Amino acid sequence: MAVEKTNSSSSLAEVIDRILDKGIVVDAWVRVSLVGIELLAIEARIVIASVETYLKYAEAVGLTQSAAVPA
């Protein structure tokens, strides 16, 4: 995936539109320790995308499989 460079500035609306179109994932892991004792651990994965973009990529990796309905 190539990074596109332009000389013109982008408006906030264009940036938000691009993020929703392509999607962005923030994966964070934080651990707070004091004298070797873990006090707090936080793991987070934040996905920012439009519903259409999320469903397209989630289907590709098998996250949208529906539960079978008994007949």
UniProtKB/Swiss-Prot annotation:
Domain of life: Bacteria
Location relative to the cell: Gas vesicle shell
Role played: Gas vesicles are hollow, gas filled proteinaceous nanostructures found in some microorganisms. During planktonic growth they allow positioning of the organism at a favorable depth for light or nutrient acquisition. GvpA forms the protein shell.
Chain spans, region Beta-strand 1: 26-34
Record region (Beta turn): 35-37
Region (Beta-strand 2): 38-46
Family according to the record: Belongs to the gas vesicle GvpA family.
Native source species: Microchaete diplosiphon
Annotated region described as Alpha helix 1, given as residue ranges: 12-22
GO molecular function, a single term: structural molecule activity
Main location: other
InterPro entries: Gas-vesicle_GvpA-like, Gas_vesicle_GvpA, GvpA, GvpA-like_CS
Protein name from the UniProt record: Gas vesicle protein A
Induction, per UniProt: Gas vesicle formation in this filamentous organism is restricted to specialized filaments called hormogonia which differentiate at the tapering ends of trichomes. Transcribed during hormogonia differentiation in red light. Probably part of a gvpA1-gvpA2-gvpC operon. Transcription is maximal after 6 hours, degradation of the larger transcripts occurs rapidly between 9 and 12 hours or upon a shift to green light. All transcripts disappear between 12 and 24 hours. Gas vesicle formation is induced during hormogonia formation (growth in red light for 1 day) (at protein level).
Any one Gene Ontology cellular component term annotated for this protein: gas vesicle shell
Keywords: Gas vesicle
